[in-house]
């Protein structure tokens, strides 16, 4: 559940950033395309980094050793 919710948050942030980029940096069609490409690429890269770290924590390669403290 948390994976889907956070993925949706990344999607919403990407859409809002794309809209803000289109409004604030409106300098022509080729420049708009470059800015939107950079924003979308940055959003996808941040999401992929988060997803890889999140999924890696589900099945760790090294099992933690618990000490028996009484």
Curated annotation (Swiss-Prot):
It holds the Pfam family ATP_synt_H. GO terms for molecular function: proton-transporting ATPase activity, rotational mechanism. It comes from the Eukaryota. It is a multi-pass membrane protein. Keywords: Endoplasmic reticulum, Golgi apparatus, Hydrogen ion transport, Ion transport, Membrane, Transmembrane, Transmembrane helix, Transport. It is found in: Endoplasmic reticulum membrane; Golgi apparatus membrane. One of its GO terms (cellular component) is proton-transporting V-type ATPase, V0 domain. The chain crosses the membrane at residues 1-21, 36-56. InterPro entries: ATPase_V0-cplx_e1/e2_su. Subunit of the integral membrane V0 complex of vacuolar ATPase. V-ATPase is responsible for acidifying a variety of intracellular compartments in eukaryotic cells. PANTHER family: V-TYPE PROTON ATPASE SUBUNIT, VACUOLAR ATP SYNTHASE SUBUNIT H. V-ATPase is a heteromultimeric enzyme composed of a peripheral catalytic V1 complex (components A to H) attached to an integral membrane V0 proton pore complex (components: a, c, c'', d and e). Belongs to the V-ATPase e1/e2 subunit family. This is V-type proton ATPase subunit e2. It comes from Arabidopsis thaliana. The gene is VHA-e2.
């Amino acid at each position: 559940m948390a994976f889907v919710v956070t993925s949706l948050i990344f999607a919403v942030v990407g859409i809002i950033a794309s809209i803000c980029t289109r409004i604030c940096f409106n300098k022509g069609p080729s420049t708009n395309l470059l800015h939107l490409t950079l924003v979308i690429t940055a959003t996808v890269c941040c999401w992929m980094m988060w997803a890889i770290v999140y999924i890696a924590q589900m099945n760790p390669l090294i099992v933690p050793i618990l000490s028996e403290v009484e």
